[in-house]
Amino acid sequence: MAAPGLRDIPLLPGSPRRLSSRTVARGSQGPKHGQQYLKVPGHRAPGQRDNSSLHPSQVSRRESSRDRSVINNYLDANEPPSSEARLSRMHFHDNQRKVDYVLAYHYRKRGAHLGHGSPGHSLAVISNGETGKERHGGGPGDVELGPLDALEEERREQRDEFEHNLMAAGLELEKDLESKSQGSVFVRIHAPWQVLAREAEFLKIKVPTKKMYEIKAGGSIAKKFSAILQTLSSPLQPRVPEHSNNRMKNLSYPFSREKMYLYNIQEKDTFFDNATRSRIVHEILKRTACSRANNTMGINSLIANNIYEAAYPLHDGEYDSPGDDMNDRKLLYQEWARYGVFYKFQPIDLIRKYFGEKIGLYFAWLGLYTSFLIPSSVIGVIVFLYGCATIEEDIPSKEMCDHQNAFTMCPLCDKSCDYWNLSSACGTARASHLFDNPATVFFSIFMALWATMFLENWKRLQMRLGYFWDLTGIEEEEERSQEHSRPEYETKVREKLLKESGKSAVQKLEANSPEDDEDDEDKLTWKDRFPGYLMNFASILFMIALTFSIVFGVIVYRITTAAALSLNKATRSNVRVTVTATAVIINLVVILILDEIYGAVAKWLTKIEVPKTEQTFEERLILKAFLLKFVNAYSPIFYVAFFKGRFVGRPGSYVYVFDGYRMEECAPGGCLMELCIQLSIIMLGKQLIQNNIFEIGVPKLKKLFRKLKDETEPGESDPDHSKRPEQWDLDHSLEPYTGLTPEYMEMIIQFGFVTLFVASFPLAPVFALLNNVIEVRLDAKKFVTELRRPDAVRTKDIGIWFDILSGIGKFSVIINAFVIAVTSDFIPRLVYQYSYSHNGTLHGFVNHTLSFFNVSQLKEGTQPENSQFDQEVQFCRFKDYREPPWAPNPYEFSKQYWSVLSARLAFVIIFQNLVMFLSVLVDWMIPDIPTDISDQIKKEKSLLVDFFLKEEHEKVKLADEPTQRSQGGGDRSRRSRAASSAPSGRSQPGSIASSGSQHTNV
C-alpha cells in the first residue's frame, strides 16, 4: 500500500510514467530461485518504453542486450563491472546516482545448498531496472535456496511493502541479492532532484540565494581590533575553506519550486549538500507507513521490530585514505579530530555542515565552556598560590604548630587512644590554610559571576550561530518533528484499542491514519500512564535511598576501620590518612558502577512512561538521569561538607552507632581539607576513568569483539571478501550513534564540580580545563572515526541542558555560601577578630575555639588504657564552643557558639543576596542578542525584500519581452499595409489615416 498522498508522483524528471503499486515488478521465481528481488525503475531517455508493460520474455531479451550490467559490489572481478570505472564508493553501480541513505537488515534461510558453479559468479543486483544477465535454472553458479521460515518470510514481506512505499514517494533504491544462506543486505536509497525539491519546499529548508552581502564589523576601531585579533590567532585557525571568506554571507530563503530563479543552482546534484539530502530522506523514512507491520509509521518502528537492523546516512568517504583526494570527513579528521591539533580552534561551521546543527551547537558550547575555564583556572591558581604564600603568616596555624602551647587534647577513640598534643596536627593545619583562607571567599563570588557570564555569553554565541546558520524561524520545524509518534507509543495505543474493542478497533486503526485520528481512545490518557508514573516515583525514591544507604555504609566502614586500626600501635598514627584515602576510593568505585546502572534505570523508567514523541522522551530521560547521577556523584561530598563532625557529641557524652563505635569527627584543622581530598579524587577519577578510559577503551573492545565475531562466524566462503569494501559496509561496522545525552551529562556533572564546591577546591577549574582539552578531541575523533554518521538535526538551542546549567549556577551560590559559613573557619575567625580579640588580631584564636573537659567525668571503660602521656592530665581540650566544667551549666553551648551561629546565618543571607544581585546585574548588562547581530538581521530582512522584488521585476520583464516583440511585429506589418494604401487615403478627406490610429481628420 502506498503512503497516503504520495500516489501518482513522477519518479524522474521528464518521465511520462507515474509510479503506482503495479509498476514495481518482481523477479521471476524459477525452480532454483525462491527469493523475490526488488526492481526499481532507473533512468530512461525520453520516449523509452517501460519494461513493466512488456512480456517477460521481451524483458529478458531487452535486458540481455544491454551493453552495461549493474553488478554486486562483491561480484567476481573476472566479470567486467561496467564500461565506466566506479566514480566513488558512494554511488549506485551506474556511477550516476549518489547514495543518500542506507537501510541494513540481516536475513537467514533454511535448507540452502550450492549448485555446481562457483559461488563467486552467483551474485547479481536488480537495481532501478538495470540488471545483469538472467541466469536460468540449471546453469553454472546457481544457488538453490530453501524456503524462509515464517518469521523471516513475514519480515521480508514487510520490507518489500515498505520499500515499495518508498518508491511510491519518489525515492530510488538499489539492493543486493540474498544469495547466501545468511548475511546482511544493504538497501541503498537515492533521492532524485524532484524529490529533494518537493521535500525541501515542504520542510521549508532555507537555501542560499544568488545574493551575497558583506558582514560589517562595526566602526573603524572595531575593524582594526578584529584584524589584529585575526592576525594574532591565524596559527590557531583550522585550515578549512569556511574560514577563508567569513565576511561574506548568502541571503537565504526557504526553498520553493515556483521561485527557482532566486537560487544559485549551478548543478542540481550538488545544490543540496550531503547532510541536507540525508535529512530529507530521513524525513520520508519517518513518515512512510507499512500496513503489514501493524500499520506502523516510519523506519524507527521497523527497526524496533527487528525488520531492519539499522538505517544511517553515509560518511563522505574514508578519513585516512591515501592521496590528495579530500572530503569533509578527511578534512575534519586532519584539522579537528586529532590530538596533535589540540591548540587549534574548532571548525564549527564545517562541523555543522557535516553533522548538522544539533551536534554543531554541542561542540560550540563545549568550546565556549572550555575557553571560559581559562580565566577561572588562572584565578584559581592565584588563590592557591596566595594560600601557599601566606602560610607562614597565618596566626592560627602558627599557634597550632607551636610546641610551647600545651593544648592537651581528649582521646580520639575509647580505651586504645591516648591523650595527645595539638601541635602533632601541625601538618594538617598548614595544609588546610592552602584552601581555607580569605581569598576563597573572593573566588566563590567570582565563580558565581563567572557562571552567569558563561551562560550569558553562550546565549549570545547561540544567537550569533543562529544568524550565520539561518536558524531563525525554526519553531515550525521543531513542531513538525514532534508530530511523529514513537513506535512504543503506537504499540501501546494499539494494545489499548485491542483490549477495549477487540478486532473492530484494530480494523479501525488500519482504516484511519494514526496521525489523523485524535480521539481519546486512540491516544494514551493520564489513566493509562498512571501505573508508569507510580513506578517512576517509587523507583526514583528507591534509587535515591539506595545511594544514601551506600553513603551510610561507607561511613560505617570509616568508623569501624578507624576503630580497628586504632587498636594497633603501629597503624595508630596513620589512621586518619588511611581511612580517608580508602573510603574515597570506595566512593569512587561505587559512583562509577552506579552511574552505569542509573543510566540504564533512567532509560527503562522513561520507556515505562511511554512518551509520545522522541523529544519528550529525551527530555524526561535527561531529567531522570541527571537527578540520579547528581545524587550519586555529590552525596559523599555533601556528607563531608555539611554533616561530618556535626553529630559527634562531646567527651563524656559521645554519640555511638552499633553499640560501641563513636561517630567520626573532623580533623583538628577542620573538614575542609578532607572535603578537598574527596572532591579532587572523585572529580579526577570520574574524568580519567569514566570520561576518557571508558570512551576510548570500550569502543575499541567492541570493535575488536565484532572483528573476532566476523572472523569466527560460520558462513559460506566469499571470494570477493578481499576486495575493497564499499562505504556502506565500512559504516555498518561502526558503532551506532546514540545521542548527545552522555556527552552533555558528563560535562554538566563536571560543571557542578567546578561551581558547587569551588570554595573548598579552587584548583577544580584547572583540572576541568586539562580534561576538556582532551575531551574535545576525544569526542571529535569518536564522531569522525568510530560512529556512524548521525542524521542532521536542525535545532536553535541546546534545549533542556541550558535550564539545568542555569539551575546549577543558582544552586552553587547557596552551596558555596554554606561551605564558607559552616565548613570553613572563615566566620569564626571574623567573629573572634572583631568581637573577642583584645588587639584586633587572631592571636589566641585556637585557644578560643577549644573547650575544657574534666577527664574524671569520662564514662567507665572509655578512659585510655596504659596511658603513656608524659604528664598527669586533669583537663583535656576538644574543639567546640561549650561552657567549662566549673561553669553553672557545664558543657552547655556557650555564648560564643550562638554568636558564631548567628554570624554564619547572616553571612549566608548576605552572600546569597549579594551574589544573586550581582548575577542579575551582569545578566542585565550583557544583552542576549549582540548588537551587530541584531543590526545584521534587520539588514538581511531589508536586503531580502529588495532582492525578492528585483528578481520578481526581472522575471516579469523577461516574460513580457516575447509579448512585446510579437506585438511590435504585428504593429509593423499593420503600418506597412497602411503605408501602401496611404496615397488613396490622403486623397479622400475624412478617411482614417492609419489602421492603428483612433483619431480622424476633420
Swiss-Prot record:
It holds the Pfam family Anoctamin. The gene is Ano2. Its main location: membrane. Belongs to the anoctamin family. Residues 49-59, 992-1002 have a biased composition (Polar residues). This is Anoctamin-2. It is a multi-pass membrane protein. The term 'anoctamin' was coined because these channels are anion selective and have eight (OCT) transmembrane segments. There is some dissatisfaction in the field with the Ano nomenclature because it is not certain that all the members of this family are anion channels or have the 8-transmembrane topology. One of its GO terms (molecular function) is identical protein binding.
